[in-house]
Amino acid sequence: MRKDAKKESMPEGKESKYKNYPIDFSKMPCAYWSDSAKISYLQRRIIVWSIMYYEHDESCVPDITYDEVSKQLVELQKSVSKQEWEKSTYYYAMFDFNGSTGFDIPARLLKKDRVYLTGLANVIHSQWKKDQAKL
């Protein structure tokens, strides 16, 4: 970087907002995502992990990670307006998610979302199994 070039950074006060969470939204490219995009991202992770756990009987993430990301999602949902939260991709399936369990979420998905997220979960699970075999 040139000496005179300015380093791109978050507006003051925004960085600390995400510092103690497992997913750091203060870093690029997600630093400028809308709150509904951040919620959608966390929802997608929770749903994929739930599919893996409840349908493959295995998880690629420890329970503590699932719990921390769930807590981050719940707190982010509480911190935004209802209108912003309702813009999230999977609001219709996770409107009452409180972080305690995700067993019923996959069954609530629209067929197209269910197919997409199950496919994603299958690919992630398959790669995780290959990685585990190398250990």
Residue ranges and their predicted role:
Residues 2-135:
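Phosphate/adenylate-binding "loop-and-lid" substructures adjacent to NTP/NAD/dNTP-binding pockets
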